[in-house]
Regions:
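Mg2+-dependent prenyl diphosphate-binding active-site environment of isoprenoid biosynthetic enzymes
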Residues: 1-237, 241-254
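Short cytosolic juxtamembrane segments of multi-pass membrane proteins
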Residues: 257-258
Length: 258
């Protein structure tokens, strides 16, 4: 587990969660625990995603994947342990002194990472290797597999702050941000190289999988991701100077090279 965490990563989801928490006045000691939980869910998903039965990858974040560095059985258990640890942290009283808030967070994280979210999206991703999916189905796949964890990162601060008027604002922000992130990921798979990206590229093309880039075309995909980021920034601009770091993060999503 230490190996998986220490090899690096962008930590985007916890960064987004902490920035929104700052905007809404959530205490750092509370938001940090939820940020750790979402990052551990993300770590679990990557470890399992890299397994031979899934994407069968041997490189992640520029280092050997968990099942290559250790073995397949260990990698499965590591993923399981990350998932358990995420819920152990988020359910603790230190996360929030209101048990209803903690229950709400647990429910949302379970939905975002389970069959109605990330796991459901991964199932659609496996189906995409066997049959051609429509653009609508690809959008659904990415909304579940990638977008739901972004959604949790954006709404969890509203739950922590008990400010539910902002819930819809940040949920809308997350939908645009998550899709822009996935389009950029698909573009990096086509245009990037393994050294910069930190993982093998060209995988989807080799597997014959349809992606947002293959269906939209590279130029249209770039325009779409740029438009989504511009729309997401407009949503949070009313928060003024407090949203500056969050705006920088949004711009980073389409300017990154890994």
């Amino acid at each position: 587990m230490k190996y998986v965490v220490k090899v690096g990563g962008k930590r985007l989801r916890p960064l987004i969660l902490n920035e929104i928490s700052s905007i809404l006045g959530v205490k750092t000691e509370n938001s940090d625990r939820v940020a750790a939980s979402i990052e551990f869910i993300h770590c679990y998903s990557l470890v399992h995603d890299d397994l031979p039965a899934m994407d069968d990858d041997d490189l992640r974040r520029g280092h050997p994947t968990c099942h290559i560095e250790f073995d397949e059985a260990t990698a499965i258990l590591v993923g399981d342990a990350f998932q358990s640890l995420a819920f152990e942290i988020i359910s603790h009283k230190k996360t929030h002194n209101n048990s209803e808030v903690r229950c709400h967070l647990i429910t949302e994280l379970a939905k975002s990472s389970g069959a109605e979210g990330m796991v459901g999206g991964q199932m659609l991703d496996l189906e995409a290797e066997k049959k051609t999916l429509s653009l609508e189905k690809i959008f659904q796949l990415q909304r579940l597999k990638t977008g739901e964890l972004f959604r949790f990162s954006c709404i969890a601060p509203c739950i922590l702050a008990e400010k539910f008027k902002e819930f819809e604002i940040f949920e809308n922000f997350s939908s645009k941000l998550g899709l822009a992130f996935q389009i950029k990921d698909d573009l990096l798979d086509v245009e990037g190289n393994a050294i910069d990206v930190g993982k093998k590229t060209g995988k989807d093309l080799k597997k014959g999988k349809e992606t947002l880039v293959s269906l939209l075309g590279k130029e249209n995909a770039k325009k779409k991701s740029k438009a989504l980021i511009e729309e997401s920034i407009k949503i949070i601009e009313p928060f003024g100077e407090k949203a500056k770091n969050l705006i920088d993060l949004a711009n980073f999503i389409i300017s990154r090279n890994k």
